Amino acid sequence: MNLKNTWYAGFVLVLLQACTSSDAYLEQGRALLKEGKTREAIAALNQAVEADEENAEALNTRGVAYFEQKEYSNAQLDYDQAIQVAPNFYRPYYNRALLKIAQSDLEGALKDYSDAIRLVPDTARSASSDLYLNRGQLFATQSQVQPAITDFTKAIELNPKNALALYNRGNLYFNQKNLPAALADFQKSVEADPAFGKAFYGLGLAQLLNNQRDAACLSLKQAKQLGYADAVNAVAQYCQ
């Protein structure tokens, strides 16, 4: 009995050491990835996976590193494996959706975004906002305007400072000739991100259509100053 207990305690100790070692390599890999040292990150993450084959975080992060290297088949394998060992972990679905977009598999990406949205914790509001933003952009590229607006609206509810969601919804409203709604979204977008030249450009065009020439020229000149190329011609045409 004592021998069995000793063996069990030793097994638990080895298991804990393996998990600790895997997590240490994972953190090392993440740090290297943030520094742009992708190859070194993959080497560290290889060790994390060798120490614990079911470390879904390590598999997902290595998938991201492979994706950055454009090694799409390896990224796919890691995301698939992460989902297999942790099917309720939203991040591999999120990242696999990005991979599928790069591979022009839009239907597959849409499904993965939807799964990630279903699984993302309520506490992860920023990540959830980005998921709705990305799925909304996918709907928009497929000319599914109302689903796109619905997703952008949800993204904004989760993060009122999501400048890209505000811009995208404003752009759809602009195309629908809903000028008041477009103006409001473009204005909030530039307030959320004062360096967002494209949003200043959209705001300027909406202001022009709303007979606010002085305000429009200020917005267009700001877009030009921020380096948004289309603003150059707009300033020359409307603000001289």
Give names to the regions the model predicted.
Residues 2-7, 17-240:
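Alpha-helical tetratricopeptide repeat
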Residues 11-13:
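Hydrophobic helical h-region of N-terminal Sec-dependent signal peptides
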